[in-house]
């Protein structure tokens, strides 16, 4: 898979906001973003539902705190305890009700002056609904043995209701050696 340097432009802000605290990375996968965050001097708590992904992350980035967790369940962090949360393509596996509960958990855990950096599958993705025969709910599909949600701009804005959206842009990245359309956002809790 191609390395994706999407965090580079955000690193100065992440460093400033996370000074003295931890960056929570939801869905760390093999640890590419984790490595970038650690190289920038951040203290990272990397999470993933997959023990295999956590093992890969641990091998590639040995000095990181790892937690196996399901993003669809309540997060094991205190209220308003995290200055930065990064969630790159890790919030699209859930029904809409669970997705909105995740948004509430993100707000609960983030400090009042904290930031959320997130990327979501776009409905303009080249592989939108790939290999799917079953739409479970609008823009949410059964894909082989998993589920996958795709977001249009109104869905991203609904997910971020109660947030001050500082940045929202649709981009094309490379994933699995193919183009992939994603929404990228940076948001802060609204007053």
Which role does the model predict for each range below?
Residues 1-23, 29-74, 117-191:
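Class I (Rossmann-like) S-adenosyl-L-methionine-dependent methyltransferase catalytic domain
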Residues 100-112:
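A short glycine-rich, Lys/Arg-flanked "PGG" loop and its adjoining helix->strand segment in the class I
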Residues 97-98, 179:
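Short, solvent-exposed loop/turn segments at secondary-structure boundaries
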Residues 21, 81, 113-114:
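Surface-exposed loop/turn positions
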Residues 75-85:
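A short acidic, Gly/Pro-enriched loop at the edge of an enzyme's catalytic core
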Residues 92-94:
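A short His-aromatic
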Residues 87-90:
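A short beta-strand submotif of the Rossmann-like class I SAM-dependent methyltransferase core
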Residues 96-97, 129:
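Conserved catalytic-core motifs of eukaryotic protein kinase domains, centered on the activation segment
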